[in-house]
Amino acid sequence: MAHCVTLVQLSVSCDHLIDKDIGSKSDPLCVLLQDVGGGNWTELGRTERVQNCSSPEFSKTLQLEYHFETVQKLRFGIYDIDNKTPELGDDDFLGGAECSLGQIVSSRMLTLPLMLKPGKPAGRGTITVSAQELKDNRVVTMEVEARNLDKKDFLGKSDPFLEFFRQGDGKWHLAYRSEVIKNNLNPTWKRFSVPLQHFCGGDASTPIQVRCSDYDSDGSHDLIGTFHTSLAQLQAAPAEFECIHPEKQQKKKSYKNSGTICVKMCQVETEHSFLDYVMGGCQINFTVGVDFTGSNGDPSSPDSLHYLSPTGVNEYLTALWSVGSVVQDYDSDKLFPAFGFGAQVPPDWQVSHEFALNFNPSNPFCAGIQGIVDAYRQALPQVRLFGPTNFAPIINHVARFAAQAANQRNASQYFVLLLLTDGAVTDVEATREAVVRASYLPMSVIIVGVGCADFEAMEQLDADGGPLHTRSGEAAARDIVQFVPYRRFQNAPREALAQTVLAEVPTQLVSYFRAQGWAPFKPPPPAAKGPAQAPQA
């Protein structure tokens, strides 16, 4: 499971802080806290204290891990420091603000009003936070071939492969090993990329040893030859290096080489990360599809999966809140289309597989996750649960919008469809076709199975064992479906479901944009630095 974990640093500044010192301005410091659950907050770090300043820009940054698949609630507190004790209880509180880390990274620069307590602003005070990923995203990309390698196998040609080692601490450390090319003395290896830090420690002059060997299945690989170089020399590609076998060189005066290694291309490139795309302005468009088929049971019966408990929740709503609360931070307008499928809908009571939950087909958008919840609760008594369970219509619906975004040929939009269902999909072939077509578009599909049905068909859509294929044999470009049964998380912490179903989204998003060759889309920075309405964390 590919969780998106990386280190980010936050830069903080404030404007128009209230003055607590008589005859001078305050001496502010910022402290960062993170919600660790159960109403508890833990301190992650503090900035330096800035003397006599009502609009400080703190030079010390605050560092923390970023996890896409969880809501990381943060609290910033600004204090006027008038003593040397580390405790803040004896210092004046100048205001605070709460938000999620997702809101910060998706906004690029987030400005919030400072509050003394809920509903009481700290004058005109504001706090501005920006994020930067602490990661060297540079990679070394190479294309390498060889000519006239020595024959090492008695009954055939050599089976050559390459190994690149970097020098460090007096040792040679393996940085990359190529695939084996069978029975070939003039091989061309696949293009490959290695993180720059791993390849040479970020230093283009670091000695690099390249070994070419003949593969043996018992592990006793035979050396064909070796040479020494550096990234700086490799970047002069196209370049050729003689492959030398040291023992042969010593024994034979007529020995020239054991072949030639040809570096056709060697470049240092930036391999963009998920945060690069998000902070570059990529909007994640979230759409929900809810199963209203008859197998859910009569919503008025406590046995129904659609039955609303006295607290107003059920498995459908719990799953929606879990996933939606994470994804909503990455969509600036917080307007989410929501659909139902498998029900007879008024006024003609025809079965629909993509009806708007708010019954407004021209504007199916709901305001925030709460808006989807409200639309669901209002739609439930107005439809007749029926069938069958068809996924393809909603997948194709979202795919049409994803195709329009793809036609813009930039990394400005990605689509995530959440399907909540209680049973096996009926239109299996049509759904396979829809998923395969969608795999060529900027979108991912998350399926959460509620109830205790047989979800084997869903597991097949989640093609972890290999690419999904249509009946005609067309293969998916990439794996875009993630399926989990809700019951597996029934007794787990609330955030566990979202952590599992969203874990693959960053990788899926990056793989799509990289395949298209699209760098992060960077819209103009916000025009004004005005305070925003404090979002609900």
UniProtKB/Swiss-Prot annotation:
Residue intervals of the VWFA domain: 285-505
PROSITE patterns noted in UniProt: C2
Cofactor(s) required, per the database record: Ca(2+)
Binding site for Ca(2+) 2: 21, 80, 82, 92
Superkingdom to which the source organism belongs: Eukaryota
Segments forming domain C2: 1-114, 123-245
Subcellular location: Nucleus; Cytoplasm; Cell membrane
Keyword Repressor: yes
Binding site for Ca(2+) 3: 153, 159, 214, 216
Tissue spec. comment: Expressed in liver, spleen, muscle, testis, adrenal (at protein level).
Keyword presence, Cell membrane: yes
Gene Ontology cellular-component terms listed: cytoplasm; nucleus; plasma membrane
N6-acetyllysine sites (modified residues): 171
InterPro entries: C2_dom, C2_domain_sf, C2B_Copine, Copine, Copine_C, VWF_A, vWFA_dom_sf
Described purpose of this protein according to its UniProt entry: Calcium-dependent phospholipid-binding protein that plays a role in calcium-mediated intracellular processes. Involved in the TNF-alpha receptor signaling pathway in a calcium-dependent manner. Exhibits calcium-dependent phospholipid binding properties. Plays a role in neuronal progenitor cell differentiation; induces neurite outgrowth via a AKT-dependent signaling cascade and calcium-independent manner. May recruit target proteins to the cell membrane in a calcium-dependent manner. May function in membrane trafficking.
Family that this chain belongs to: Belongs to the copine family.
Name of the molecule in the record: Copine-1
Native source species: Bos taurus
Gene that encodes it: CPNE1
